[in-house]
Amino acid sequence: VDRSENIRSKSMRIVRDAFMFSCFTGLSYVDLLGLRSENIRHIDGHLWIVSRRTKTGTPVNIRLFGIAAGILSAYMHNNTGECIFSLPSNGICNKYIGIIMHEIGIFKHITFHSARHTFATTVALSNGMSIEVISSLLGHKSISTTQIYATVDRGIVAESMERLSENIDSLYSQIDSRRKKSLIRVF
């Protein structure tokens, strides 16, 4: 994002920030468009988005951290009922995102919806979040919808196998030697 400092217009900067916010929250364009200050709550010392998906009506509760919290603080207004992000149409947002991506040397076709995929895969899944939790955060009614996002990469498989190995080794080390011998004979 640092390389995009020459972004020309205020509108383009808002789109960039909203896109990044979506990368760290999983909110869709339409849900971000309707995000208001009353959807932001302080719960247990943390900021949360408490809302409902526009598309499905399912409840969504997303804890804000790091980059997303920083972006929110730059756009949060005290006026209740006011949208946090004043965004142009989805088509204009996608056009701006394309321009921004080219300016920073990314030449793939990226749309606002790509941010939602980024959250599901790069942010959540690759950091060990379960598919069930991701499904809830994305506001999906069915896990099968979430599985579209869940491309499993080798790193995740390797980390999961490592955790499994450590757990089994830990359990095995707690068994006395006599029981270990009987377990080995079974196999």
Locations of regions flagged by a protein language model:
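C-terminal catalytic core of Y-nucleophile DNA break-rejoin enzymes
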Residues: T54-S73, N79-I99
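Catalytic-site neighborhood detector that most strongly recognizes the C-terminal catalytic loop/helix
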Residues: R53-G57, N90, L138-R163
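Short, contiguous acidic/charged loop-to-helix segments that flank catalytic cores in large enzymes
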Residues: N6-S11, S51-N61, E82-S89, F107-S114
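C-terminal catalytic core of tyrosine-transesterase DNA break-rejoin enzymes
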Residues: M20, F24, V30-D31, I99, ...
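Short basic/aromatic active-site micro-motif
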Residues: R13-R16, P88-G91, F107-N127, H140
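C-terminal secondary-structure termini that scaffold catalytic or DNA-interacting sites
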Residues: L164-F187
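Basic, Lys/Arg- and aromatic-enriched nucleic-acid-binding interface segment
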Residues: V1-Y29, N78
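Conserved tyrosine-mediated DNA breakage-rejoining catalytic core shared by Y-recombinases
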Residues: V1, T25, G34-I71
